[in-house]
Structure formats: structure tokens, C-alpha cells
Amino acid sequence: MSDLETALSLLQNKLRRQILERLVREPHYPMQLANLLGVSQQAIVKHLKELERGNFVMKMKLPSEKGGPPRTIYSVQQSMSLRIDLGPDLFSVEQRSLPAG
């Protein structure tokens, strides 16, 4: 699957788009996302793994403040633009990378 096809496939899911909406603002733990979006942590983790495979997000292990096992936090990994032009005698889909920030 091409990068464009991967991006379109991943973004067709509404929950994944909602997850990305939160992660572009700031990194989150899966449980935070589950609480914010009103779905199970298991569902969030499943979608985060898909987004990670597509290089949309990355995970980092942070030490626990209470001395427990490290906690996993997710953040957006890349800046990109998808553009779809559609009309009579017109169909164009374009993906391009954007500078970070």
C-alpha cells in the first residue's frame, strides 16, 4: 500500500481522526484519550497501534512518578497535508509533507 493509500485508509476511521485531533495539541496517555473520547482504553490502544504503524504517531516510555512501571505516552510524529480535488472531469489526490511546527 502506498503512503497515500495508507494515510487515506487510516484517516477513514472517525475515532482515529478524533485521536489525532487530541494528539496534535499535546501528547496523551491512552487512558486520557479513552476518558476524553468516551471509549475503552483497549479500543484506543488498538487504534494507536494502527496510527503508529502508519507513522502518524510515536510512543514514548516515561518513568512513573509513583515508582511503578514506565508509562506510555503518544504524540504526533509527522506534519502532512492531504488534498482531494473532486468535480466534473476532475479527480486529484495529493499528499505532501509539511515542515514540523
Residue ranges and their predicted role:
Residues 1-8:
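Short, Lys/Arg-enriched N-terminal segment that forms or immediately precedes the first helix
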Residues 35, 52-53:
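Alpha-helical residues within the helix-turn-helix
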Residues 47:
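Residues within the DNA-recognition helix of helix-turn-helix
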